[in-house]
Amino acid sequence: MTSVRKTMELIKELVSIPSPTGNTYEVINYIESLLKEWKVETVRNHKGGLIATLPGRDTSRHRMLTAHVDTLGAMVKEIKADGRLKIDLIGGFRYNSIEGEYCQIETASGKMYTGTILMHQTSVHVYKDAGKAERNQENMEIRLDEPVHCRKDTEELGIGVGDFVSFDPRVEITSSGFIKSRHLDDKASVALLLRLIHEIQTEDIELPYTTHFLISNNEEIGYGGNSNIPPETVEYLAVDMGAIGDGQATDEYSVSICVKDASGPYHYQLRKHLVQLAEKHHIDYKLDIYPYYGSDASAAIKSGHDIVHGLIGPGIDASHAFERTHKSSLRHTAKLLYYYVQSPMV
């Protein structure tokens, strides 16, 4: 089985490459170069996602597995009179989850600037309502790490409306086996799929069905994996994080098998097949329901594709904020993926 340490190191590399939805070219290039090194056939779709294909014995029925490499982020909405930046969020999260975070601003010419996302009324020595003021677009801003005093100063740096903003991942691997970072959703799963591909190649595993691996790049806005699905595809498995919180079964130490999200139930027979594989191979798993969640698989169903769809992934604490998971969850997810791609279809 693939090394969890190598998976965690790959996650660290991936989260360190900024890739907010809409600006994923650099990380897609990086992944494409890895797959080329491993002599894996790839093609890009027009949306900018990457599809890798491994041939199988049965070429009439295909599988597709997907994970998304796009992350939460922001765009410059306005340059304020004092030279600071108002932002517009990309993806589903709240301003409080990025308050105090370091960030990067990429200009249209490709130049990078750094800054910090702050409340305008941050100083408790000046603003009486510093703790009570609402964290919203009007009150949050980017303080640039440049000597700017007015709108013109910022414009002269080349910064403008529509420039992408990415957040510092602050990635760290602990001695106790955790990896904590922004954007484990869903770069942890991308790393798992890449390590699976590498394992299939190096072990010369013959897959029962031709299998496609889609690295999607628009999942955080709802349509990453809803197209470019080969017509022979029967099973479609999204690999994405399991969410942890009150009333949830998911934890940081097992693989999550989603039975239902905001789109409705996932395919019952595929769910049962995944559970049977987990029990047969002594894989720790949790069945769970995510009420405010969607995936590439649910997006594909909504787009009208006639597929058997499923969703599994590592359990991620504090999703869409300061995320964390444990090597145990990564190991169990990797194990289930390994046995799934070699199993018969439902």
UniProtKB/Swiss-Prot annotation:
The source's superkingdom equals Bacteria
**Might you give the EC number(s) for this enzyme?**
3.4.11.-
Keyword Glycoprotein part of the UniProt annotation: no
Q: Enzyme class, one word? A: hydrolase
Please list the disulfide bridges: none
Task: Indicate the residues that form the catalytic site.
Answer: E219
> What residues bind a divalent metal cation 1, as annotated?
H68, D185, D240
The family database entries (InterPro entries) matched by this protein are listed as: Peptidase_M42 (IPR008007), Peptidase_M42_aminopept (IPR051464), Peptidase_M42_dom2 (IPR023367)
Q: Which family does it belong to?
A: Belongs to the peptidase M42 family.
The name under which this protein is listed is Putative aminopeptidase YhfE
What is the originating organism of this protein? Bacillus subtilis (strain 168)
